[in-house]
Amino acid sequence: MNPTLIKKLQDFFQKNPITIGEPSTADELLLVEQTMQLKLDETHRYLLLHYGGVVIGDIRIYGLKNTELIGDETFVELTNDFREQMSIEAQQYVISVDDMGNPILVDTATREVILYNHDIGAYEKLFNSLEELILSKLNK
């Protein structure tokens, strides 16, 4: 992972400890990958292993053990819930939800962060990667 991003995350979370959840173990993440039948995004994996579910700027990035600012619902539960409601590709999973209730997903094949807009029934690319999304929030 990008060393600049790692440093920025360390600085951000040192100044904003309330935005940190509880880190997951590598074994927990391996079990999730086996259950979901996909490989987690590298940046999301890093966040989960070091910080858990977090809030960075105005975005909630769900984990298995979230900051209390997010609540208890995991990214696995979100993904399963949205899979019941709409068509999510096998290589995609939900990492967040916007203020309108639209899921924000990572596509593990392309690394892109995409939003599914319920109102128009279409996907919209938000960022080329989760890393790019996080940097955009940290640089504000």
Please tell me what each predicted stretch does.
Residues 118-121:
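Short, solvent-exposed aromatic-acidic interface loops
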Residues 123, 127-139:
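Compact, glycine/acidic-enriched structural inserts
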Residues 107-110:
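Short acidic-glycine loop/turn motifs at beta-strand connectors
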Residues 1-104, 138-140:
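A surface-exposed partner-binding patch
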Residues 113-115:
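Short, compact, well-ordered microdomains
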